[in-house]
Amino acid sequence: SFFVSRRLNPLLAQEEQISLCEIGFASQTRRLNPLLAQRGSDLLRKQGGFDMYDVAIIGAGVVGSAIARELSKYQVNACVIEREEDVCNGTSKANSAIIHGGFDATPGTLKAKLNVRGNFLMDELARDLDIPFKRNGSLVVCTKDQDRSGLGKLLDKGNANGVPDLRIIEREELIAMEPNLSDDVTCALFAPTGGIVCPFHMTMAFAENACTNGVKFFLNTQVDTIEKNGDSYRISTLHTDTKNKETFEAKVVINAAGVYADVFNNMVSENKLHITARKGEYCLLDKDAGTHVSHTIFQLPSKMGKGVLVTPTVHGNLLVGPTAVDVDDKEAVNTTASGLDSLAATAARSVKNVPMRQVITSFAGLRAHEDSNDFVIGEVKDAKGFINAAGIESPGLSSAPAIAEMVTDIVKGLLPLEKNPDFVGTRKGILRPDTLSLEERNKLIKEHPEYGNITVSYT
């Protein structure tokens, strides 16, 4: 059956009714969704009464799922442990859905290196895994009251990071590209390699392909404790629905737990991490507003982030956001009247006449900001076999494919990995009936009656 949940995936509210989330990932039958069919201990290798793995990944967001897919290229017994009922239910589901060019990160940082590499990998991944992706280009705009030297600094950073084809353009050319830019905009940094993607479909693609290649996913499974046990780690979990307890054993643990990555790191290491949840609120506008801009419009960045952007989405809507407020609660994904009100005023500095009356939903997400202001990726010095992929805030979505490569290289130094001769590198994405003719839809429903049973939930 069809399933739509704005609570679970706000960005999928972009696709109206029948096209919202055809045969949704969390609601597929076992015949349609092999990932959910793997929830059985009969499939597991046992050792000492525990489920024994070479690698256990904590977190099924875009980073954890990308790592799972990259590892599945090798003969490795791996699993992913996720406390939510589906993949992509944390930071990965509620963000700007941008593939950044890579000009903002400080040269020499992991953010800089991995953003540029991840951006480069997206064309092939989008083709092979059927991920909705478009290189629409991005513009960082400068207004009359701002110092345009800020654009020059971004250009220098981008050149140092290896971002291709960056240039600063003046208002006359800008207005020809984007007629709805604010009258105060004077110039902009243009990055043609910037893009937009559906983060839910991207994460789902990684997870499904990893599953196809043998990685086991355990959903509704909350990690309670992690303890060193000789040459491996013992992971105690609680099933969030049944309340059954289960213990996993793994030679290598990969910590991709988003805003909770510091909690798990601090269970095994004296080198403590501190991750702050940085809340960002968004407004999603109707498809009628989707052509208001064609590029992703950024404002000059600050220490809190890249400002409020205005961007089309791959589904044809318009997205405005985010705010940036540090919060103590790692579950604080509520929206606020003040936050949403501020979006319209702030967006107007770069784009005029944004039709905010056409907002169809609002949502908030949390970014995992680590005190070092960079990604924290690597084996923990005092916890051999425990690998962090922590502090993954923007540009984390863009960097995910490259993070997966980096983490897999670290695993290669810990375990003898051999290529998987049966690796399947392609995957067919979710079929959208709204792209089919009436004749094609009828044929589809005849072959798969599930496509004729539509349920829309607004929980």
Language model features: what each stretch is:
Residues 53-79:
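N-terminal Rossmann-like FAD-binding beta1-loop-alpha1 element of flavoenzymes
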Residues 113-116, 141-150, 190-208, 218, ...:
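Short beta-strand to alpha-helix junction loop
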Residues 97-177, 186, 307-308:
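Dinucleotide-binding Rossmann-like beta1-alpha1 core, especially the glycine-rich loop
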Residues 73-92:
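Glycine-rich FAD pyrophosphate-binding loop
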